[in-house]
């Protein structure tokens, strides 16, 4: 896709560049504005987006272990996703059978091709699909639909030479209903140009009254950019059950403008056409789409890292619960804690990211290496334990230790060391619990409350 190609490079440059953080942020925001405006996104929307990004930068602090640059890209990812529809996940599988979809759109949008792509999409999902050709104004429309139907093995209903579009649509739907088709797609006329929305909507109303579809889908060509706003908003007002398909996303630089314009109306973008082939129609997911624009690998890495930090925070909460007497610490908890730490990066990197630790040079390299090696061994040991052993380490005797050491490729001494570490944690927790009770007792004597 030509859409926002240079943003991927901008993300990479931002994450790996050597300029100061503030300068890098300023440069990236300029690049973002330039890219969005050249993709025909409405200027007001662009500046509203970048203002939100700046506002969040001012008010939000990155979680512990997350670098500022990574957190900035996460904010950009969130706000760009909102620009294109946020967390809206279109419902593509119908909740009833039979299900009638009526396609409308102006001429030249690729509506008939889209009808074929849609039929292929649902056929692949295992539905019995029928196509109705009710575009009576374009001479080759029915012929094109029949060719597509033949290519994908889907029956097509049409009446060559007949000019009554409403009648054709009605008879086609009735025929397929009698044949127990599960999804019926009706291709209607696209004889009106942009700016003639009223006539298009009037025709849509007449066919709608005749066939009572379950869904009306407007097909829009991505190359019209932000002009899609007027068409989509009028369509959205006229048809509350309406969804939208944006075609030709691969062949224009204005796709971003079309997507953001449609999203601004509140209409649901269901699919986007990403090429000419019959299978090049994809369900539109704003977050997945933005991840691809920004560079899927970079975004996934950052999101995964943030998720791991959240997992680690959950582990910390679990420890707090154990100390307060609400829970019990098991080796399974120790395992989850180590996994969360491991995924957040090497120990040296974690020490760098910890706020307030400016003594990195004082932590010997060989000590860090020993820590990494110990972590690796302990994970291997716990992977060789049964669920029963993880949940109740007190049952691990010498013969079990031998089996665990053999299964994990470690020494019995390593297994003993892990068990000793676990027992030390247990003793520490008991001590903390006792202290907590003593403090509460003391506060009680003075009529205070524990916090």
From Swiss-Prot:
- Recorded family membership: Belongs to the GTP-binding SRP family. SRP54 subfamily.
Q: Give TM segment ranges.
A: none
Species whose genome carries this gene: Acidianus ambivalens
Q: What is known of its domains?
A: Composed of three domains: the N-terminal N domain, which is responsible for interactions with the ribosome, the central G domain, which binds GTP, and the C-terminal M domain, which binds the RNA and the signal sequence of the RNC.
- Function summary: Involved in targeting and insertion of nascent membrane proteins into the cytoplasmic membrane. Binds to the hydrophobic signal sequence of the ribosome-nascent chain (RNC) as it emerges from the ribosomes. The SRP-RNC complex is then targeted to the cytoplasmic membrane where it interacts with the SRP receptor FtsY.
Catalytic activity entry? GTP + H2O = GDP + phosphate + H(+)
Q: Name one GO molecular function term.
A: 7S RNA binding
Lipid biosynthesis listed as a keyword: no
Cellular component GO terms held in the UniProt record: signal recognition particle
Q: Which residues bind GTP?
A: 105-112, 187-191, 247-250
Give EC number(s), comma-separated.
3.6.5.4
The stretch of residues making up the signal peptide is none
Alphabetized, the UniProt keywords read: Cytoplasm, GTP-binding, Hydrolase, Nucleotide-binding, Ribonucleoprotein, RNA-binding, Signal recognition particle
The lineage's top-level taxon is Archaea
Q: What is this protein called?
A: Signal recognition particle 54 kDa protein
Subunit architecture: Part of the signal recognition particle protein translocation system, which is composed of SRP and FtsY. Archaeal SRP consists of a 7S RNA molecule of 300 nucleotides and two protein subunits: SRP54 and SRP19.
Q: Which one GO biological process term can you cite for this protein?
A: SRP-dependent cotranslational protein targeting to membrane
Annotated localization: Cytoplasm
